[in-house]
């Protein structure tokens, strides 16, 4: 059932959008779901999974990642600075770098563990007070700090656009921002807007309910 849902999404992207040159990676957002629900996807060969709480993910994924070394774990939630050590231990990607303080903590922890995670800067694309993320005006300076001073491996940008009728415009804006700072990856698009996101350059889609169903 879950495998069928994943394949339906892939087929829909293939049929409705010209993605002959690239295929966006689908991150199956497995947060709050038990491993018995997730395991069929892993055994099927799906590799990318998203979690939003470091310690919960550690309990759930530590052994699985040893058993299935091809699995890539994506931190998609807000990271508390006192949880950075767990994130660096377990995860392969961070999609939610949103402050200088967090960037510094990640840099320190990576040096301790001799690791280099692939990182997205979270952009507050709608300039919303209630959301985290780097403002458009600060993005260039923040990117330079992360890459030059802290030596972080910034591969792209991530956004959570406002829930309004301008979602496509935000996706277009994100693509333009990525081109300006010369990063290739865009983490944008979820269960309700992944087709629009793909049309406008998303390379990573974060899809939860469309694969796993609604959470309890």
Where are these predicted regions, by residue range?
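Conserved alpha/beta-domain cores
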Residues: 1-185, 190-192, 198-200
């Amino acid at each position: 059932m879950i495998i069928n849902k994943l394949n339906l999404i892939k087929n829909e992207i293939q049929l409705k959008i010209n993605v002959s040159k690239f295929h966006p990676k689908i991150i199956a957002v497995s947060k709050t779901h038990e491993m018995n629900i997730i395991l069929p996807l892993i055994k099927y060969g799906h590799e990318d999974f998203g979690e939003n709480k470091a310690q919960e993910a550690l309990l759930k994924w530590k052994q699985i990642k040893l058993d299935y070394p091809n699995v890539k774990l994506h931190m998609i939630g807000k990271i508390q600075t006192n949880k950075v050590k767990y994130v660096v231990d377990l995860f392969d990607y961070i999609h939610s770098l949103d402050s200088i303080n967090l960037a510094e903590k990640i840099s320190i922890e990576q040096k301790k563990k001799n690791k280099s995670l692939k990182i997205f800067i979270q952009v507050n694309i709608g300039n919303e007070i209630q959301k985290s993320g780097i403002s458009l005006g600060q993005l260039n300076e923040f990117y330079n700090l992360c890459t030059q001073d802290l030596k972080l491996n910034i591969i792209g940008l991530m956004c959570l656009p406002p829930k309004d009728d301008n979602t496509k415009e935000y996706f277009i804006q994100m693509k333009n921002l990525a081109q300006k700072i010369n990063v290739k990856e865009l983490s944008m698009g979820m269960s309700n807007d992944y087709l629009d996101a793909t049309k406008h350059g998303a390379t990573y889609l974060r899809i939860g309910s469309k694969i796993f169903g609604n959470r309890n």
